[in-house]
């Protein structure tokens, strides 16, 4: 395994491996059948591991001993049972509280240890979302105040936030599009026909999310340059990781302004 870091001048320096694999777990080893396109994994404070087995429409819960603990493929809500459909994101706070981004069912659900639905977020309404908005959650995270953060499909405005009652509260972490001076120059002098064929400058999508104990949101996004692919968002939605201006992006201790 190759492990490296950067020195003061931005040059690669190879280092001893910080982490190496200790073992592997598969659906076959667990006795529940092979995983099919798993899209997320999460752990709780008790050492349980939660796998979003997306292609099999289920969540697999693995105990601290790496043995199968339970499978969640259906949930109970208001006396009715419904099946999960392409669950793609998870956030676990122990067996008593698990959030699932149930993507193809267009909902985020909170379930207890008996697979009973405690809370559902679906079809949020707001003027800022638009009449044609389709809620397809992909990733989910929850902070200490029970605020729910959701990465949704085809949402470029940022991460959707919901209050403790599941009501839409707005966006956070919106990524501003950076246009180079050369691009601005050509856009200014191009014809209408040329502009219609030019690249659309829309923000990139977020791809992953996690929250630390202090309430900071860590989010990854599709950054082709790799300069801001990981962001650390404060409660105001500002990225507080040092940006790549005179130093390397990713430094938590020194933020350049």
Question: Which residue ranges define each predicted feature?
Answer:
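Eukaryotic scaffold repeat domains enriched in small/polar residues
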Residues: 1-257
